[in-house]
């Protein structure tokens, strides 16, 4: 019952688990080392789908024929030059699945992404996906100033 529940509640996590059990110990050891080094011993799992309802800022950006990369989700809102504590675990585009995708992978509408991260990174990802000001900063490195436009 718990396997079925997990597959329904966390479908990407379930796919990830089914794929990694086919990998060898060396691959698994490298992944565990990367998780420990870049996050900690208890990373959070975050599933993100690029859609209008869950990631409206990214969705609208991609809909306007702009290009975005997985690295967008790793940007620190404290300092755009830094990456948060995140490890991409899986990228699913329709029926194609990439395990441990690179930051340089382009993201598209409909993509489903599984990330391991800490709480701070999770918060930044949610802000980037849903808040126009934070998204603008993540894309440009500049603060979006529209409230007092033209007033000095």
Name the predicted role of every residue range:
Residues 1-152:
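Cytosolic regulatory domains of K+ homeostasis systems
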């Amino acid at each position: 019952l718990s396997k079925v529940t997990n597959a329904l509640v966390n479908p990407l996590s379930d796919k990830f688990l089914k794929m990694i059990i086919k990998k060898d110990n060396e691959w698994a050891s490298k992944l565990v080392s990367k998780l420990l080094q870049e996050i900690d011993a208890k990373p959070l799992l975050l599933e993100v789908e690029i859609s209008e309802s869950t990631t409206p800022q990214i969705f609208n950006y991609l809909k306007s024929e702009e290009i975005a990369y997985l690295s967008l989700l790793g940007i620190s809102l404290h300092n755009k030059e830094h990456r948060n504590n995140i490890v991409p675990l899986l990228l699913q585009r329709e029926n194609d699945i990439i395990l441990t995708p690179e930051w340089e992978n382009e993201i598209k509408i409909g993509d489903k992404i599984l990330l391991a991260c800490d709480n701070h990174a999770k918060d930044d990802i949610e802000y980037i996906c849903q808040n126009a000001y934070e998204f603008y900063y993540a894309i440009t490195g500049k603060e979006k100033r529209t409230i007092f436009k033209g007033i000095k």
